[in-house]
Amino acid sequence: MLIIGCKKDNPQLGNPPTLAEASFAYSVSSTSANVLNLTATSQNYQCLWDFGNGVKAQGATAVASYPYAGTYTIKLTVFNKGGSRSTTQDVVIAQTDLSLLNNPIFTKLTGGATGPGFKTWVIDSTQTGHMGVGPDPESALGTVPEWWAAGPLDKAGAGLYNDKYIFTLNGFKFDMITNGDVYVHNSLSASFPGSFQNLGDFTAPYGDQLDKTWLLTEGTSPTITVSNGSFLGFYTGVLTYRILDLTDSTMQLQYGHHAGGLKWYLKLKTE
């Protein structure tokens, strides 16, 4: 099944890609019937893949792994100055192959297929820089919170340190346990009824966000995106987090700001 979509972002810059230019082919890899090699027809356009399995990738070629049997919709979006166009194809994976879940990011984030299959993460509140901010774009100093870095327990009582974030491998499920409140940037307080000023920003009543999902975008700077309604740490209006460092028990993230101009930083640890 092939589905197409087109978006013309700026007609003054020319036409968006054609249907033919947005097409792609796939083939079964030599390593596993559950691993597909994807190739965009247009090698010179910016290409964004959604494998339909909770993973995204960029580039004219990509490799998609499907540990679980089922039908998946692969989506390719190609971009030029005139806009974008998307096409999709459905693929059927006949058998489950759990060995494909040995992705190191999956394993560190969730415990992996041979472990518990989920991990609970919390803010590493006793570490300097567990929350911080710097410029966007980054300065020559790089990925550091050069403008401000929280000291140990700086935000105690703000509704941040008792939050829990549970990443589950099966179905890429994500649960956000708030214990009744969250900590949000002052510019977003109006979106949270009942919020009140606290330690420079706002604490807001907010219930648990259960049965959400998380999505990994792989590459040189892998990112995690959580689904609407959920988020990680101090809320700045974005849902995508760049992984700066990830071990079996610690995680450092960088993320943006809804109005631009800022990069926020977060340190977490396993519970």
Predicted features along the sequence, with ranges:
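Contiguous, well-ordered beta-strand patches that form the walls/edges
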Residues: G151-L246
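Extracellular/lumenal mature domains of secreted and surface-exposed proteins
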Residues: G5-T120, S125-Q127, R242-T247, L262-W264
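Bacterial N-terminal signal peptides
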Residues: M1-I3
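Generic short beta-strand segments
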Residues: Q43, I123-H130, T178-D181, T225-F231, ...
